[in-house]
Each structure stands twice: as structure tokens, then as C-alpha cells.
């Protein structure tokens, strides 16, 4: 009998249906949503997810045992009976963003990998394109800071990341350590000059 290993995904409201290792050595975990309702895309009323499934999407997730890991999900759909023309809405769960190729956890991981590293280095290490790293960076950093969510500004850090190897191509990341110990990105500045 083959040995089994159980690893928590730390993703809520899903059930694991299948796991497989593809021919190119990638771990693909097929999951299904357990959330029964969604908000209508037009009137925002809760509707039942009883209108089938959308097209399958594959999202890059945190590596498991050194393997590139992907979550495959067919999002549930619902049809609003209250709106004119009875539109359908496809479910988007809280652990990924619509049209993102990564889970939120993987985007946060990529942002941490950028500390003391370049985008090109992270791109090579993670087997991702340059634009995928930039996209993860843009998704993780809010355009505007909600200062009500910032609990503590006693510890502020400023770090620079090299966008490319060489000179004159840097961005500055401003972070703050919260009371619970988590690091929050406050801003990404276009360069490291004092005038910014």
C-alpha cells in the first residue's frame, strides 16, 4: 500500500476531489466550492448556485514538496430570477481574484520573495514570466491605503527592489509591522529618490 501524506491547503470552503502529478512534474489539485450562494452581479442580492459550472480555471498555488502546484476549480454559477433577462453570475471565492492566474496566498509569497531580490531572479526561481511577477505585485499593493486598517506605525521599513539587474531601475517598498506581527505593504514607490 502506498504511503499517504495530508497537507492542509489553508483555503476555506472547498473540497479536494482529486490530486495528480502531470507529465511535466506539476501537482494539480482539483477542488470544488462548498459555498451555496453568490451575489448577483447586477442587483447584488444573494442567489443560489444552481445554474451549473463555469469553465475550469487553473491557479498557481504555493509549492508542495518542491513541485509547482496548481488548483483546478470549476466555479459554480447562479441565475438571478429578480433581474430583467435573468442574468447568470459566476462565483469568485475569497482566496483568488477574478482573472488572476495565482491564488492570493501565492501572490503574497511572491511579494515576500522580492525582498532582497530582483523581479528577474524571482521569475527564474518560480518559473514564471516577468509580467506575472509584476501582476502579483500590483494585486498585492493597494493603490490607496485604508488607514483605518493600519493598527500600528511604530515600526516602518523601507526596502528597495531592483526591477532589473544593473543600475537605475529600482522601486521602493514601504512596509509597516502591525501589532499582530504581520507585515503590511503601505506603498510601492516608483523609485528610491528622496523627492518621491
Residue ranges and their predicted role:
Residues 1-85, 91-92:
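Short, conserved DNA-binding cores of transcription-related domains
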Residues 29, 40-43, 80, 110, ...:
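Mobile genetic element proteins and their domesticated derivatives, centered on retroelements
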Residues 45, 127, 138, 142:
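Residue-level detection of the helix-turn-helix DNA-binding "recognition helix"
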Residues 58-60, 99-102, 194-196:
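Short, surface-exposed linear segments at secondary-structure transitions and domain or protein termini
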Residues 84-106:
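Short, Lys/Arg-enriched anionic-surface-contact patches
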Residues 102-117:
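Short, amphipathic alpha-helical "recognition" segments used to contact nucleic acids or chromatin
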Residues 120-136:
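Short, basic interhelical loop/turn and adjoining N-cap
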Residues 132-196:
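RNase H-like nuclease fold core
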Amino acid at each position: 500500500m502506498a504511503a499517504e501524506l495530508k497537507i492542509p491547503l489553508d483555503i476555506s470552503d472547498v473540497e479536494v476531489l482529486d490530486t495528480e502529478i502531470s507529465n511535466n512534474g506539476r501537482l494539480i489539485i482539483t477542488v470544488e466550492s462548498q459555498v451555496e450562494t453568490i451575489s448577483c452581479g447586477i442587483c447584488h442580492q444573494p442567489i443560489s448556485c444552481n445554474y451549473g459550472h463555469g469553465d475550469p480555471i487553473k491557479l498557481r498555488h504555493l509549492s508542495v514538496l518542491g513541485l509547482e502546484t496548481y488548483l483546478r476549480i470549476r466555479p459554480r454559477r447562479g441565475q438571478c430570477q429578480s433581474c430583467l433577462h435573468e442574468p447568470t453570475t459566476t462565483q469568485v471565492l475569497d482566496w483568488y481574484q477574478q482573472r488572476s492566474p495565482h491564488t492570493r496566498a501565492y501572490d503574497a509569497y511572491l511579494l515576500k520573495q522580492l525582498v532582497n531580490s530582483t523581479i528577474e531572479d524571482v521569475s527564474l526561481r518560480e518559473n514564471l514570466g516577468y509580467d506575472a511577477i509584476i501582476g502579483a505585485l500590483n494585486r498585492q499593493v493597494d493603490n490607496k491605503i485604508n488607514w483605518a486598517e493600519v493598527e500600528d506605525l511604530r515600526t516602518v521599513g523601507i526596502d528597495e527592489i531592483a526591477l532589473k539587474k544593473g543600475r537605475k531601475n529600482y522601486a521602493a517598498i514601504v512596509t509597516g509591522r502591525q501589532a499582530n506581527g504581520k507585515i503590511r505593504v503601505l506603498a510601492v514607490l516608483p523609485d528610491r529618490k528622496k523627492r518621491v
